[in-house]
Amino acid sequence: MYFVTVNGKEWITAHDKTLITFLRDELNMTGTKDAAAADWVLIDGVRTSARSVRLSELKNKEILTVEGIPDGEMAAIAAHLAAPAALSGGFFAPGMAITAKEKNHWHEARPASREILDMVSGKKKFADDINVPRQVYVRPIFAKNPGARIIKIDFSRALENVRFGDCIQKADIPGEFDGMVGVGDTVESTNQVAALVVTTYLAEMDALCRLIDLEYDAVTESVPRGTPEMPECATAVYSDDDTLTIYTNGKDPQKIRESCAKALDIPEDWITVVATPVANTKSGRAEVYAALVAWLTQQSAKIKF
């Protein structure tokens, strides 16, 4: 068991994990963002990346997130940060607030607007902050061995786990989408997705992904995928009338709508794309993956990678 003190309250959890995962997925504290420079918290008063520290390292430590900054102090910080107009869409604003809190680089100023205050306090919702009831979670399995051909995608071991939901492959795509590689295809890069693992148990996702076996006709040298500074993410909400609402942080909602409709082979007016504040210019694939899973499973789906 792990005991973690966050914003003056002690929490208990059974499994070791990164602090960012614990805050966002277990405590639903979404003010701290899963991206470099947006993931700052104070640990015993020292600014620390929540993505770089695990719960096992936090015994007897005091953690302060952006949600734990008192309202009066947060209002002053928001006013200070608004002065240089440096907030842009607001995604990195909570990390800036933690930095200001640590260094006391703030002062009483004229009140900030509600929009600015929501940005700085982390209350402004981005695509990765959206959670809906009874949603499933999705994780892509990326191909390896560029230049080799995939000869088998085997998820029989995963079927033995009661928490396994599904494994979506290229052959399952109803329409046209070039964002996946399947059996018989030659891998061009390690950014290509071979399968989408689905489960309702986010805590089991890593274990389930390890049960998916990809076989190739050769082993080649490739550069491993690094951890992105900012993840791609999207949530697709499935409705009983066979319509989808997709939450994106991409810059072009209409293009995303067109891509999703083409992949699902359905009319565009069955899809509504809700643009949360822009946070990732690489967005575009995640929305289609989420839409595919939501459409095929008839459940709302959330993906992040």
Model-assigned labels for residue ranges:
Residues M1-M96:
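Signature of N-terminal electron-transfer/Fe-S-associated modules in redox systems
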Residues D44, R51, V66-G68, P84, ...:
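Fold-independent oxyanion-binding glycine-rich loops
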